[in-house]
């Protein structure tokens, strides 16, 4: 099993949590980014910097992640592409993406995009906090356990 991370948009605390699990459970972590980042100094972690361009990191993740892998991303359209391919996806706040909830998640995302474009709502998500980190860690633990049992 491999865990892929859409590294440009993922909070550092979530990346650190994945690496902590990787060291304990012995799986590979692949950080995919559109710009260079500092790679954590662990053998289980690889940094893949893709050429810059719209959706280049997303396209790389969809092309290379396989069923049985997990992708950490907050990009709902990316998660939809992954779920359709049979790849597990989880956002850094611990909310899973699957075929049952993708329609609703896409509709909500599109609604808020439209409202933002019209100036009716502003800003984005609240800052990533301790509660988010704990919720993510719990969801990650459950999902990794489920994925490891299915291999």
Curated annotation (Swiss-Prot):
HAMAP family: UPF0178. InterPro entries: UPF0178. Disulfide bonds: none annotated. Pfam families: DUF188. It comes from the Bacteria. Belongs to the UPF0178 family. This is UPF0178 protein PST_0536.
């Amino acid at each position: 099993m491999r865990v892929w991370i859409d590294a440009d948009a993922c909070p550092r605390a979530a990346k650190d949590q994945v690496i902590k699990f990787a060291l304990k459970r012995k799986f590979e972590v692949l950080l995919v980014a559109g710009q260079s980042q500092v790679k954590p100094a662990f053998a289980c972690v690889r940094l893949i910097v893709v050429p810059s361009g719209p959706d280049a990191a997303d396209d790389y993740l969809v092309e290379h992640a396989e069923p049985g892998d997990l992708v950490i991303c907050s990009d709902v359209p990316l998660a939809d592409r992954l779920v359709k391919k049979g790849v597990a996806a989880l956002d850094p706040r611990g909310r899973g993406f699957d075929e049952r909830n993708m329609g609703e998640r896409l509709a909500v995302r599109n609604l808020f995009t439209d409202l933002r474009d019209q100036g009716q709502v502003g800003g984005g998500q609240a800052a990533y906090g301790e509660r988010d980190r704990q919720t993510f860690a719990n969801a990650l633990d459950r999902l990794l356990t489920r994925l490891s049992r299915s291999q």
